[in-house]
Amino acid sequence: MAREKFERNKPHVNIGTIGHVDHGKTTLTAAITNVLAKKGQAQAQDYGDIDGAPEERERGITINTAHVEYETEGRHYAHVDCPGHADYVKNMITGAAQMDGAILVCAATDGPMAQTKEHILLAKQVGVPALVVALNKCDMVDDEEIIELVEMEIRELLDSYDFPGDDIPIVQVSGLKALEGDSTWESKIEELMKAVDASIPEPEREVDKPFLMAVEDVFSITGRGTVATGRIERGKVKVGEEVEIVGIRDTRLTTVTGVEMFRKLLDEGMAGDNVGLLLRGVQKEDIERGMVLVKKGSITPHTQFEGEVYVLKKEEGGRHTPFFAGYRPQFYIRTTDVTGQITAFTSDDGSNVEMVMPGDRIKMTGELICPVAIEQGMRFAIREGGRTIGAGVVSKIIK
């Protein structure tokens, strides 16, 4: 019997559960898999399967994350759930689990709490485009008015972080009751998934975006010219197309005269391919690791930006001592280290701090010594002597 082929007949969307500790994120995740499993759209998982999330390493940082997958009528979902609050912070900042949307879990018994706010803020800053609210533990609240008050409070909170509070669906659920097989609450899980299908937009495919490839290596082929190799991050590139070389030095235009993959010639390379691009009129000295090849006119290099950063603890291999404004580390951006300076910072809630301790989360302003292709929403690492001491995401380009 031939093996079954993975059918990519449904659009794929990445989501996750976020929210305050003990509001029921993991129980809800388990409930979703159990309810959908009854329709043959998931493998049922219990709380323990998800809660015992294995450790993963992303950019030198250890993160616990559980991954589950399931389907609805119209989509295939990959869903991430993190056991600890610190794991969420690291996960969202490193982009270890890219989210196209999230289910914000808030217990009706408590209403929004500190981490509810922090996760909404994080979602905004790292560019999670859409949220759906699961108002959990509704089986424990008899008074409909209390539920209405909590809903109003959540909507105001979402508004205050620039999410469309009035339009975001809030679905009353009970993860626990649904897990226990109570049909009333099982149908609420189905209602939640319909809201997710409808309100979380399908992400634009990487292949449809303008071409970009970060240069990993460069070599010359006698008689043919210079080849730049790397993985195409987005878009596609055809033989004969003009591309720009951006970053580190002045931007220059060249033409792609050949695309190779695994020593075979291609007409075009596309997102996800590891390719070598033969470039017309470019000397080996003109191009280096850390530059990017891009669709003409699609991107400009920058030196100043704002970022959200998680600074590693000593136990995670980070610094043992604090640092101050004016600190000069390396910023590892795409494929290379660029020296820069952290010119200013505040703590993540905007309050002023004199120094940054290992384990802190900060908003920072950075300035690089040479212009590089940085973009809003892009991830970077902060390194010192080749070891990672922080991870960040670009929240704003200054210049």
Curated annotation (Swiss-Prot):
Gene3D superfamilies in the record: P-loop containing nucleotide triphosphate hydrolases, Translation factors
Region feature (G2): 60-64
Record-listed E.C. numbers: 3.6.5.3
PROSITE patterns: G_TR_1, G_TR_2
Keyword Cytoplasm among UniProt keywords: yes
A single Gene Ontology CC term: cytosol
Keywords in alphabetical order: Cytoplasm, Elongation factor, GTP-binding, Hydrolase, Magnesium, Metal-binding, Nucleotide-binding, Protein biosynthesis
Role, per record: GTP hydrolase that promotes the GTP-dependent binding of aminoacyl-tRNA to the A-site of ribosomes during protein biosynthesis.
The protein, known as: Elongation factor Tu
Organism: Prochlorococcus marinus (strain MIT 9215)
